[in-house]
A protein has these predicted regions:
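Bacterial N-terminal signal peptides that target proteins for export
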Residues: 1-8
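Short amphipathic alpha-helical boundary/capping segments
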Residues: 58-63, 114-118, 174-178
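Post-signal peptide N-terminal segment of mature Sec-exported envelope proteins
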Residues: 29-52
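Disulfide-bonded cysteine-rich modules in secreted/extracellular proteins
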Residues: 49-54, 104-115, 164-174
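Accessory alpha-helical DNA-binding modules that contact the DNA backbone or grooves
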Residues: 71-108, 124-167, 184-221
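Bacterial signal peptide processing site
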Residues: 22-24
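C-terminal motif of bacterial Sec signal peptides marking the signal peptidase cleavage site
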Residues: 17-20
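Small-residue hinge/turn detector
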Residues: 65-66, 121, 181
């Protein structure tokens, strides 16, 4: 009887041990499965403000003092990055350019200037220059897409533009210009053919003020 009781005790202990092991394995598997189906957190997208279009509240949120904000608003439009940086002298431009910028003309900007774009080094600045002249932003995306992924190409679009020929550029090319919406694109097309930039200023000047007209003129040319 004593041997039988001992055998029962051993059997019960072994059974409890096996059940415990099984539960531990199942728990580990469930934890692993849960970890596997979790999607990695995507980094928050960074908004890059156009220095010519950022609102007063945008500029304040970027950390500019009231004095600098007033100077920036009064000096716009900035027709080059040097015009912009002259006002923010003393600021941490390396960090600021990740958040605010004056888009660069892909066909006329010096190669060395492209390197002030965050994340653009010697090699990429060379590639930007290598494929000139650009006739459309689509061409830029296609050529630079040989070297970086689609997401990185899209990021570059906050920092550059391709000027458009007023009489021949497509509607999509015009809409790709910084700060050009559907309505203004329509007006650009409406007054074709343009004989000269004076005509462009006269017609488009019906819809925007002098400052905005100066900003828009930077994006266009006539053959």
């Amino acid at each position: 009887m004593k041997k039988f009781s001992t055998l029962v005790a051993i059997t019960l202990t072994l059974s409890l041990f096996l059940v415990s092991c099984k539960e531990a394995v199942e728990k580990k598997q469930n934890t692993t499965n849960t970890e596997e189906i979790k999607e990695p957190k995507k980094p928050a997208s960074v908004v890059v403000f156009n220095a010519n279009l950022a609102t007063e509240s945008d500029l304040v949120a970027l950390g500019f003092s009231a004095e600098v904000v007033n100077k920036l608003l009064a000096a716009r439009p900035f027709l080059s990055m040097s015009d912009f940086t002259a006002i923010i002298e003393g600021e941490n431009t390396e960090e600021l350019f990740k958040k605010i910028f004056v888009p660069l003309n892909l066909n006329t900007t010096e190669e060395k200037v492209f390197k002030i774009i965050p994340g653009v080094g010697d090699k990429m600045a060379h590639e930007f220059e290598e494929y000139r002249p650009y006739t459309s932003i689509l061409q830029f995306k296609r050529e630079i897409g040989k070297y970086v992924d689609e997401k990185e190409v899209a990021r570059y679009l906050d920092y550059v533009f391709v000027p458009v020929e007023l009489n021949t550029s497509s509607e999509d090319d015009i809409k790709a210009l910084p700060g050009i919406g559907k309505k203004m694109t329509h007006e650009f097309l409406e007054y074709r053919p343009y004989k000269n930039l004076a005509q462009f200023r006269k017609e488009i000047g019906k819809y925007v003020d002098e400052k905005e007209l100066n900003r828009l003129e930077r994006f266009v040319y006539i053959k």
